[in-house]
């Protein structure tokens, strides 16, 4: 978290609304807190950490439905993280939470698994190596691409370039009546012109 410039708080956080929403995993009615809480952009971040990798998660089925009984929520990282995230969703005005189940003590074998939680449900996401994608500068992009499944900015730009290149190629062939050996020269001239600060199609 420190390496990703995400300011975090052990167990409680400065936002009183979130603190009041925390409910014990043991169902005692008392307060309970995850290992860490943080804010990144519009997202609340919840982190539950377990020393043993085998305590990462307990699923109901192959669809990665997390068991939410007291035993599972108490023992397993992902289950516990989801418990606290749901408490925030249900009891505060914050409606976008990313809960992390983490396990392991060896940096080479540590498991970090994000879960996106909203009022409509939750989505267990692919494992990540660190928290860089969840910094204030990157988290919106992660949400758009990984949670929502939208295309990346680079892919959209590449498709736009390829579409325009095809259109230009067709125009040079159909209207410019240029052969294959002549078209690269025209394209090169256009690119050189575009690099000039004073270039304008109106001149």
What kind of region is each of these model predictions?
Residues 1-98, 102-121:
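A short, conserved, highly charged catalytic patch centered on acidic carboxylates
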Residues 5, 19, 61-63, 79, ...:
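Detector for Asparagine
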Residues 22-34, 119-152:
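Long, acidic, intrinsically disordered low-complexity segments
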Residues 138-203:
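Non-catalytic nucleic-acid substrate-recognition regions in nucleic-acid-modifying enzymes
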